[in-house]
Amino acid sequence: MSTPENRPVSFFSLFRRGQHYSKTWPTDKRLAPVFIENRVIRATRFAIRIMPPVAVFTLCWQIALGGQLGPAVATALFALSMPMQGLWWLGKRSVTPLPPGTLNWFYEVRTKLQEAGQALAPVEGKPDYQALADTLKRAFKQLDKTFLDDL
C-alpha cells in the first residue's frame, strides 16, 4: 500500500488513509516509546466519540441561555475539527517515507517473517509508515511476542 513518492495524495483521501492506518497500527505497549501513533490513535478515537456531543451541548447551552451564537458556533466547529485533525495527521503519517533507522528495522522484521515461512509481497518503492503498520500487524499475528526483543 505504498504510494509513489512523486504522486501527491488528495486532501480527502488523507482522512480515509488515516482511518485505515489507525485500524492497521498494532497498539502494543512496547511500541509506544518509539512511535507516537498509539497516543495519537487513542486521542483521535476519543475525539471521534466525545467531540460531536460536546459541540451539540455547546450550541444548545448558548441558545438556551440566550448567549451569543457566534462564539458558540466557533467553539462547536473547533470541537468538531479535533477528530479531523487526528485523522489528517494519521493519514499524512501513513504516506510518510520511513527514516533510515526505522527502515532498517522494517527490513529486519520482514526478514524475520520470511524466516518464519510467511510469504510477503515485494516492497514497491520506498516503504512508508503504512507498510510498517501492515508488517507489524502481521508480525504480531504470526510471530511470537518476543520478536521485538531481538531487534
UniProtKB/Swiss-Prot annotation:
InterPro entries associated with the record: UPF0208
Record flagged with keyword Membrane: yes
Regions that span the bilayer: 46-65, 69-91
GO CC terms, sorted: plasma membrane
Coiled-coil features, chain-numbered ranges: none
Keywords from the named record: Cell inner membrane, Cell membrane, Membrane, Transmembrane, Transmembrane helix
Domain of life: Bacteria
Claim: Transmembrane helix is one of the keywords in the record: yes
Principal cellular location given in the protein's record: membrane
Pfam families xref list: DUF412
Protein family according to the UniProt entry: Belongs to the UPF0208 family.
Protein name per Swiss-Prot or TrEMBL: UPF0208 membrane protein ESA_00924
